[in-house]
Amino acid sequence: MKITAVQAYPLSIPRPQPSWTAHEISTEATLILVEVQTDAGLRGYGEIQSGPLPLVCRLVEQFGEIIRGMDALAHLEVWEKLFALTSPRPGWMRGQDDLPPPLPRGQRPQIMAALGGIDIALWDIKGKAANMPLYQLLGGVRQEIFTYATGGY
């Protein structure tokens, strides 16, 4: 099952009331929806909560061009190929690999967010292809788990 397209959709809605963190005031809720399409007709979806939205969307679509034609079920191979772009590679410096030049180090948080959104979408495809919820695909057996949430740190 081959990857045929990767799209990034920036989403933003105004908050009814501002939200505060230690660093900023937020007047809107934003995220990026990542869609990976396959030649088998399956679509996987991932989510990114990082910005700036235009930069992260551009990175997702740039990565999509690099992984087009790869096996959508081989998420580790995709991850390794994209992760290789995050630092200088001896093979690239000698002209011996077919990947683009390394990405700017100052954009590492956005690069890793883009990579993560694609990875989540590939896991979604893997679960759909196996006709299993992801927790079962990963070996989960519990019907209930304890949760904890925090925010605004």
Locations of the language-model features?
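Flexible hinge/switch segments at interdomain interfaces of large molecular machines
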Residues: L137-R142
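Structured beta-strand/loop patches that form or line metal/cofactor-binding pockets in enzymes
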Residues: M1-Q49
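Short, solvent-exposed polar/charged micro-motifs at secondary-structure junctions
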Residues: P14-Q17, T86-S87, F146-T147
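Active-site/binding-pocket entry motifs
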Residues: Y9-S12, P88, Y153
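Metal- or metallocofactor-binding catalytic centers and their adjacent structured scaffolds
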Residues: Q37-A129
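Active-site mouth loops of central-metabolism enzymes
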Residues: E144-Y153
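Broad gene-expression machinery/nucleic-acid interaction feature
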Residues: L31-L33, G117, E144
